[in-house]
Amino acid sequence: MTIDWRQIAAKYCAHRDGSIPEPFKIKTLPKDTVLNVTKIPSECGLLTPKEIELTEKYDATALAEMIKDRKVTSVELVTAFCKRAAIAQQLVNCVNELFYEEALARAAELDEYYAKTGSLVGPLHGVPVSVKEHISIKNHTATASFLAKANIIAEKDSDLVATVRKAGAVFYCRTPQPQAIMHLETSSNLTGVTVNPFNRKLTPGGSSGGEGALLGIKASVLGIGSDIGGSIRSPAANNGLFGLRPSTLRLSRKGCQGAVSGQETILGVVGPLGRSVRDMNLFMKACIDSQPWLDDASLLPMPWRSVAPPKTLKVGIMRSDNVVNPQPPVARAMQMAIDQLSKNPDFDLVDVEPLDHKYSWDLISEMYWLDGGKVYYDLFNKVGEPILPLTEWIMHQPNVKPHDITAVWKLTAARDEYRNRYLKHLQAYGVDVLLTPVGPSPAPKLGEAKYWTYTSVWNLLDLPAVVFPVTTVDPKLDVKDESYIPMNEQDAANYETYSPEDYLDAPVSLQLVGKRWQDEELLAALDKIVSML
C-alpha cells in the first residue's frame, strides 16, 4: 500500500489543531491584507488585562523573580502564555502542538512545592519555555519536519530539555522548523508556512522560525532553538529578539532529531531566544551550572563564568561581507550603532575587513551534504514527500556532491586552515568583538531567504554570535539609492529587488560575534553595548 504524504500531513495537522482549546480560538480572524498582527492578541478579547501584562511587559528573568517574590504563580503564567500561543498559531502558524493540560499540571506541582517548602526547584522555577520541535520532549513528536518521521514519539527528553526542566521550566508548546531543518525560513510539507507577525508577507526566519514568530508575537518569553548556519540568529533578527548561537560543545545536543546524527564536520548547536541579554545569561548559566558534561561525553567541562567587559571595549566594525552589501535599513542600523558607540570613550571602534567570505560559503555549503544529500533524499522518497524550493536550492549548491573518506579529510583540513587564517586575521586587529549585520536585508519576503553567509561564516569558524534588535524599517529613512553600483550579480539581485515598502514594520537587528568558547565575554560585551543604544 502506497503511503500518501498528504494523509500524513493532514493527520499531523489535525492533532495540532485539536491541541488548541476551543475557548482559545479567535471568533473572527483578520483578513490576509492585515500584515502586522502583533497587537491582535491583546485586542481580540481572549486575554485578561493581567494576562496581557504578564505576556508583554516582562522578560524571563523578571518573571522568575516575580514567582520567587510570590507576585505571580506558575499557573497564572502558563495559562497566559498558552492562551497567547493558541492565538499566535491562528495568526502566523507557529505552533506544532500546544499541551495546555500537561503544562498546567506541571505548573500546579511547582506552585504547590514552593508553597509547602519555601524553596524553588531551580532558577527557571515556573517559567514557561517553548521548544523547537526537533529537540525531543518525552511523549511528544520528534519529526524534524520529515513526513517519514511523523509518527515518531520521543521516549525521553533530550538532555537539554531534561536540564531545563530540572531548572524549573514548564514546557507548554512545540514550534515548527522547515523541511530538512535547512532553510532560513520555516516552511514544510508537514505544517505549511510560518509567517512573520510584524509583516505576514515576510518570513520569520529559520530554521527556528516557529520560535522566532512565537516570541515575536509575545506568546513565549524564552525559547530553545538550534543553529547550524544561522537558525537561531535569523529568527531572532527577523522578529526583534535576542538570540545566542553558543560555541559548540557547551550545551548538549543529545536527543535532538535530524537526518545525519554523527556528522562532525560542521556541528550544530542549541541555544536560547529571548527578550534580553540577561535572559541569555539566565538560560546559559542554568544549563551549564548543571554540569552537562557529566552526562554527555562530547561536552567541554567548562563552568559558566561571571565576567565583566573590559573598561574600554574594542569593537570591530564589519559593515559588509564584501559579497552582498546590506540594504538601506541594515546599513542604517549599523550606522546608528556606530554613531552611538563612537560618542563614548569606553568603546574603541575599528573597521575590520572580512576574510574571503565567498570561500567560506563554498566550503560550508559543501560540508552540509557530505553524501550529496542521499540520507535526505531517502527520507523524502520513503513517503513520496515533495522537495520544496528552498530545500532544492540549498541541496543543489555548486559544490554539493558525494564524498569518499579522503575527500572528507581534505575538506576538514580546509576548514581548519580557514579557521586558523581567520584567527590570525582577527588577532591582527586586536578586537574584543565584531559588530556585523545578520543578513543583507531585514526579514526576507517569503521564499527569498537565499543568502546565509552573514551568519554561516561564524558556524564555520565556530565563533559564538548573538543577535539583538536595533530599529525597524522606516520607508522615509530607508530609501533606495538608485545610483547604487553593485559589486557582483548576487549583490545586484539583492539591491534591485529592494523596496522599503515591502518591509513595512520589519525589525532590524545586528549581530555581535565573540571569540571561541568565550560566550560569557560576548554577552558581557553585548550588555555594555545595548546599554548605549
Swiss-Prot record:
Subcellular location: Cytoplasm; Nucleus
UniProt xrefs under PROSITE patterns: AMIDASES
Annotated Gene Ontology cellular component terms: cytoplasm; cytosol; nucleus
A Pfam family hit: Amidase
Active site: K132 (charge relay system), S207 (charge relay system), S231 (acyl-ester intermediate)
Domain of life: Eukaryota
Coiled coil (residue ranges): none
Keyword terms of this UniProt record: Cytoplasm, Hydrolase, Nucleus
E.C. designation(s): 3.5.1.4
Cytoplasm in keyword set: yes
GO molecular function, one term: amidase activity
InterPro entries per UniProt: Amidase_CS (IPR020556), Amidase_dom (IPR023631), AS_sf (IPR036928)
GO terms, biological process: amide catabolic process; fatty acid catabolic process
Record field: catalytic activity: a monocarboxylic acid amide + H2O = a monocarboxylate + NH4(+)
Family: Belongs to the amidase family.
PANTHER family, per the entry: AMIDASE C550.07-RELATED, AMIDASE-RELATED-RELATED
Protein known as: Putative amidase C550.07
